[in-house]
């Protein structure tokens, strides 16, 4: 099913949140149907079984409780350049809920304002790759309405980007905070495992 897999990434958390797990594995597929079929194929394959056995001392994955999301890049993910050649990056994920009376349309409008802020950033104030994405949970009973994810070249450029947002976000920041409430971010170092468009990772 690799032809329908859009990418795979690993995340090693650097946030001390006292949870029972310390890493994330993300698989992106062309559809939920393809994701479910691919997962079942992996579980039933000798290759998958052998891989799990070989690396059992390295990681234990909670596959039964995996979560599904619809993902979008609301802004060109390469507007600030390409990701590092070695596939490394840093990421922050915040669980967000829409405030009372706010809707998906309000979220869309505030993302337009955020995109406008990104458009007007002085290039001299930034360094390295940056992109952001929104994850909408498939589970209708999920506590969060969406996850807001920021992807940076490394932890240093993440800190620089956060400071720039705090200092110059202005009305876009005010409006975003008026639409949703987001948790403290879960911060990780990430790594590309599979990218069908890059021979080094496919």
Q: What is the predicted role of each segment?
A:
Residues 1-202:
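Short S/T/G/P-rich N-terminal loop/turn motif that feeds into the first structured element of a domain
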């Amino acid at each position: 099913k690799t032809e329908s897999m859009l990418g795979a990434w690993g995340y090693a958390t650097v946030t001390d949140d006292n949870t029972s797990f310390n890493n994330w594995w993300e698989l992106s597929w062309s559809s939920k149907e393809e994701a479910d079929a691919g997962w079942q194929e992996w579980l039933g394959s000798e290759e998958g079984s052998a891989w799990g056995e070989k690396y059992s001392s390295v990681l234990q994955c909670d596959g039964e409780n995996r979560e599904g999301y619809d993902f979008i890049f609301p802004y060109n993910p390469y507007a600030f350049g390409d990701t590092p050649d070695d596939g490394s990056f840093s990421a922050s994920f915040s669980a967000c809920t829409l405030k009372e009376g706010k809707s998906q349309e309000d979220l869309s409008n505030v993302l337009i304002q955020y995109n406008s802020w990104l458009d007007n950033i002085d290039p001299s104030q930034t360094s390295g790759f940056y992109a952001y994405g929104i994850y909408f949970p498939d589970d209708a009973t999920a506590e969060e309405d969406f996850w807001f994810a920021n992807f940076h070249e490394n932890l240093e450029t993440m800190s620089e980007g956060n400071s720039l947002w705090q200092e110059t976000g202005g009305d876009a920041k005010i409006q975003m905070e008026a639409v949703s409430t987001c948790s403290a971010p879960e911060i990780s170092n990430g790594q590309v495992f599979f990218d069908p468009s890059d021979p080094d990772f496919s």
